[in-house]
């Protein structure tokens, strides 16, 4: 056993003394020691209930003959960090989470791990650690929040973000805004649409590192507790069979995950997180792969913000297995890949008798589109690529040309949008918000929501070297690479330059002569930013571009 490194033999007598201090018995020490990574806290709605999930996981481990040992990691709520300086720290936390798990599981060599995340950066951070350590492991999330309800129907947190702009233009009153904010988030769980947290939870199930149901069983359901107990038992079986994360994550299962990403209409943040996760296994995932898979994968689901359905609707419609069964019928999935059940994907789908139970939620017969939810754009404005959630773009904005309105920060753009300075036809450009330039690549949910709330969602595009919340909708194009801080073309744009967006043609161009653009370079002055945080200064010096998943540079790499 790996744990023998700190519990077995004469020389480990002092170590056992410390384990006795925990209250462990000799029998508990003899058993496999399983690390339970718990990101519970009292700050994040998606994590407030994770101690309940952790207790269920521990019960499952004990049922199967193991000894659980819990340790914590941080978890940031992107909603609470949005639209202020706190958002600089969100993406940074992904790397901190992965590193902290590596530290704990190396200093204390557990035999296996069960990881319990739920929200945006915690899921990829834990997946990165699982593949980096490559010891038997299962991920079991806290589950999605139920949608909010009023007398007018269901809604979610994004409706509240958009309501700010509606209030500013007089479309709703203060009482209506208050009703929305008090009812949008009815309880624990990751926010109820196909935003980043739920996207990553669904994809952790799709790639095989999470058990069936991990992505969609609601946080408040007893099924979620039973799933957690099962995860605790399953990790013991994986340990016995020596099935490790890199046995599950292969080139085939990566293609499965990206295919599911496109079919589900997931968050554009998956284009940052999946490459970062799979890089830990030495498996490349490029923007070209995303786009190639998107072109051949139908968009079967439009959950909020792209449509009217929520994660609990998807669960009732058959969940991730139902979507996978439909894609399998089309020959779009590899069914021979191993999963955390100890069986192949094909065996899982057969055992589950996976089928679609609601063809309005999962459009298997009449897909929303013949292409996937995400498109990769390139052109003179984004030579290394940019990302758009095309499934959440209005048809009228799939092609758009308009004058640039350029801002060097999110705050400046927000002020202009809410101040009525942005007009129909404009292209809002927000730069110096990339991984290095931000630093931390803040999410532009407030600007995109304010564009919607101000009634400009079908006439205004937004382009940024920052990123978006999974709750963003509209012609919102992010991850523009190279970013402004690296001297990318986005740094050379001026107010009034014509910007051409062609999503079907996968093009993003600034309609200025290349020689003229280059001549501007000498006069470009980056905004002066005083970065007081040593952590953010370190991050800015180490992080790669968004096109490479915004991972750290490897000092050993040539």
Curated annotation (Swiss-Prot):
GO terms for molecular function: 2 iron, 2 sulfur cluster binding; dihydroxy-acid dehydratase activity; magnesium ion binding. Keywords: 2Fe-2S, Amino-acid biosynthesis, Branched-chain amino acid biosynthesis, Iron, Iron-sulfur, Lyase, Magnesium, Metal-binding. It is an enzyme of class 4 (lyase). GO terms for cellular component: cytosol. This is Dihydroxy-acid dehydratase. The modification N6-carboxylysine is found at residue 121. Belongs to the IlvD/Edd family. Pathway: Amino-acid biosynthesis; L-isoleucine biosynthesis; L-isoleucine from 2-oxobutanoate: step 3/4; Amino-acid biosynthesis; L-valine biosynthesis; L-valine from pyruvate: step 3/4. GO terms for biological process: isoleucine biosynthetic process; L-valine biosynthetic process. The gene is ilvD. PROSITE patterns: ILVD_EDD_1 (PS00886), ILVD_EDD_2 (PS00887).
